[in-house]
Amino acid sequence: MNRPLITFATVLILGTAALGPAARAGTIVIANRTATKITFQYTDGDAKAQTLALAGGELCSLVNKRGATVNFNGANGPQELPLNTNSAYCFVDPQGKLGLREIALSANAEPTPAAKPTQPTVENLFPVAPETPAKAEAKPAGEALKKILTIPVKVLVDDDEQATAHAWKGRLSRRLQAANDIFEKECRVKFEIVAYDEWVSDNHITDFSQSLTEFEQKVKPEPARLAIGFTSQYEVPRGAFHLGGTRGPMHSHVLVREWSKQITEPERLEVMMHELGHFLGAVHSPAADSVMRPILGDRVARVKDFRIIFDPVNVLAMSLVSEDMRARDVHSFGELSAPTQLRLNDIYSAMGVAMPRDATADQYRKTLRAVPQQ
């Protein structure tokens, strides 16, 4: 019997003693993996060039309808580079020489020989294409994004929630708004609360996957598309345990643990965003600064000036999925257009090579009906 697909956000707590329309938009993701602000011009076909700026560590996804180019001041002066649609790029500056590199994504991806850096990032775990030479006031890159996809959600707490309804509704709506600030900028998606509710959770269930099953059985997402449940059910264990989970991309239910006072609000935001990322097709990432890293609750989010971001490869995946959802009435990965499924196959195959011990990418790849399964 096939086991149900469940993806989890895992947290480590240390104890004190121990097939779509013929013409459609594509997506190009550009990330700044340097420490300094970069200003560049993005041109989509014969449209007017947009002057954009990315702070160090930021990224953006850009709508691409025709052949795109990017202009910037590189190591050898002004550069003009053509960009491939539905691809991800990184500004990098090895030896102080600024360049733009495409992240090589392929179903036949091979691991890079260099590897095991102290702080892994996407661009040094995947092979990258070589840079080729080249052709107003800067605006934040997010201003170039249009056509936000709105996903209606129902937010629920269980009967173990201690706060008043007014308090928990305010707390969770603020958290979702903080998540939307990132989702809207990085992949043109926002989650809109259309209903609040409560459910009675079984105090005898201590296994998280069983709790997810119970949540699915007791709660209907209507009138929303997605039900997000916050449970205050459990004692605080030591070691690694599941802090959130869902059964896979576009699944109707997400369950998140809410109880532990050891978890700060930025860490709670990360867990929720991690699971919403799974809903949109994001998988676990080798990038140590990505919200899709496999282990959360690692205290990284407690660092001053910490910024929650997705890695560029997962932003590309989520943008591809959201574009199909925006263009068509899509409710499962099997309903995505064939070109989108094939590109997602490239992404998940490359992620699987980068993280051979993590099964998430392979599990997501197997949900793609347009891709032959081995």
Task: Pin down the residues of each PLM region.
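Propeptide-to-catalytic entry region of secreted or membrane-anchored zinc metalloproteases
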Residues: 114-226, 230-235, 333, 337-374
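Short pre-active-site segment immediately N-terminal to the catalytic Zn-binding motif
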Residues: 253-273
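Catalytic Zn2+-binding segment of zinc metalloproteases
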Residues: 276-291
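Post-HExxH zinc-binding segment in Zn-dependent metallohydrolases
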Residues: 291-322
